[in-house]
């Protein structure tokens, strides 16, 4: 890792996720949040390629929006991310409704699955994209537990219908890899990618 840090850069988080905002705030990063509508449909079936693609789309959409508004983006880095859950060859995004959340939780029950997050950095004429994979092991969930979780946790804005930092933590017996990746923003991967792209540490 480089010895210097990005103290003179302006950061924009291209995400609506309160969890990603909270991670950056807890790290002491000063940033603003800007979002833009993006097409999240894709024929890509590999979760690693998919999250990199969607992360890049989000970042580019915000960049184009700000340039159209006449913003000066010099010394500005746009951070974007996307997360999915992969299990049994299926990619799980956010559940559409309670029935979809129920289906997802039953798929995850008693199994190991992968949480895959993409990270994209755009700024000063440079572009970097990467991904992180974390394995998560769920307990067996009976129907009563699934219904209680759906009623209590409101899982509709979460990939795979759960958040590790909430009620679902009671059902997770272990993880292998980056915890923050499961929350929604892989901090180590972000710092590594920033160093590779801009030649200095993010943190």
What are these regions (language model features)?
Residues 30-32, 48:
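Active-site regions of enzymes building and remodeling cell-envelope glycoconjugates
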Residues 3, 7-29:
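N-terminal beta1-alpha1 ligand-phosphate binding loop
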Residues 16, 36, 124:
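Cofactor-binding loop segments of dinucleotide-utilizing enzymes, especially the Rossmann-like FAD-
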Residues 43:
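Short Asp/Glu-rich motifs
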């Amino acid at each position: 890792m480089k010895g210097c840090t990005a103290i003179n850069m302006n950061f924009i988080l291209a995400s609506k996720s309160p969890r990603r905002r909270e991670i950056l705030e807890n790290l002491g990063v000063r940033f603003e949040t800007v979002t833009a509508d993006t097409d999240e449909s894709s024929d890509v079936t590999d979760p690693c390629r998919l999250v990199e693609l969607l992360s890049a789309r989000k970042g580019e959409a915000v960049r184009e929006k700000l340039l159209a508004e006449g913003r000066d983006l010099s010394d500005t880095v746009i951070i974007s991310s996307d997360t999915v859950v992969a299990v049994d060859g299926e990619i799980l995004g956010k559940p559409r409704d309670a029935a979809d959340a129920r289906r997802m939780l039953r798929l995850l029950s008693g199994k190991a699955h992968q949480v895959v997050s993409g990270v994209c950095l755009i700024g000063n004429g440079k572009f970097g994209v990467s991904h992180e994979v974390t394995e998560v092991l769920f307990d067996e969930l009976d129907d009563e537990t699934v219904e209680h979780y759906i009623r209590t946790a409101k899982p509709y804005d979460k990939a795979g219908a759960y958040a590790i930092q909430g009620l679902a933590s009671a059902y997770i017996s272990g993880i292998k890899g980056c915890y923050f990746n499961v929350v929604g923003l892989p901090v180590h991967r972000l710092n590594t990618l920033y160093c590779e792209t801009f030649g200095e540490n993010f943190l």
